[in-house]
Amino acid sequence: MADLKTQILDAYNFRHATKEFDPNKKVSDSDFEFILETGRLSPSSLGLEPWKFVVVQNPEFREKLREYTWGAQKQLPTASHFVLILARTAKDIKYNADYIKRHLKEVKQMPQDVYEGYLSKTEEFQKNDLHLLESDRTLFDWASKQTYIALGNMMTAAAQIGVDSCPIEGFQYDHIHRILEEEGLLENGSFDISVMVAFGYRVRDPRPKTRSAVEDVVKWV
């Protein structure tokens, strides 16, 4: 167990936001399928899995994204794999949405009595607990929070097998939204862009990792 803990912490220390990748080194198909699987298996609020992982390997499409993604100027042309993580919009994640009903029945395979109670609880949760029905943006931001769980798991899993990564929020939302909509990737308003992440192998070693002291970020009560 001690060895496993050491291996996990080694992966966390290995991981850094890689700004430029070696374009000659590619992540194997099996390794990348493993990374994607850790995203797919990630937890989400109410188990709704409000995400889609769009793997962008087409160089022309990457260049189109690059024009409006200031945070990935070096990553887009050099990463072995580049992923757009989409989050479901209010259209799909409001308590009475068809997506939720279908997900509960077909994916979670809930019995009818459980299903009805779950829908009722979801309405209560969204309406009164977290006040998520204030706007469509509030619901989308809630869904986007879930995608960051998958994002973190994918980057950690990648680090554990020696693959580098970089999370990217540095993009012009309106332009990226337009491009994805034109490509039909937002599925008639069911999705929108949440975050991006690049994977590959570092071209150079980073400077030593720095973090706040434990006593500055942890409080016991």
Swiss-Prot record:
Its cofactor is FMN. It comes from the Bacteria. One of its GO terms (biological process) is 2,4,6-trinitrotoluene catabolic process. NAD(+) binds at residues 157-162. It is an enzyme of class 1 (oxidoreductase). GO terms for molecular function: oxidoreductase activity. CDD domains: NfsB-like. FMN binds at residues 15-17, 73-75, 169-170, 211. GO terms for cellular component: cytosol. SUPFAM superfamilies: FMN-dependent nitroreductase-like (SSF55469). InterPro entries: NfsB-like (IPR033878), Nitroreductase (IPR029479), Nitroreductase-like (IPR000415), Nitroreductase/BluB (IPR050627). Its EC number is 1.-.-.-. Pfam families: Nitroreductase. Keywords: Flavoprotein, FMN, NAD, NADP, Oxidoreductase. Monomer. Belongs to the nitroreductase family. This is Putative NAD(P)H nitroreductase YfkO.
